[in-house]
């Protein structure tokens, strides 16, 4: 139980840093801020569960954010269903892959704080149509299956 609690605290700490330095809101930073942040939090938690050093958890979080960089928030019909569900599934795979990289001893070449700051810069540069407005990206596609 203590190990799980520690992993949850690790995830919360990563999420707190991202929320402070950037955003965890799709309306502010696109899906990179939502799914990317969640993926980074999960990657760090997996490293904590594996008993890895703290730097591995930080590296895993940075790997996950780098892989999510630029992901837009474009909910079809304004509902958190399509493409959101699929992106969350991809976020799980991303988190596990990022954790595997860090757990195998691969160090992230970029500073995690810098990656978070880059995510904010990218989110700030996104047009409003790609930040949870339901106007651009997949939200602008025709719905084929009801």
List each language-model region with its residue ranges.
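Functionally critical mobile loop/hinge segments
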Residues: 39, 44-146
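Phosphate/pyrophosphate-binding betaalpha-module
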Residues: 1-70
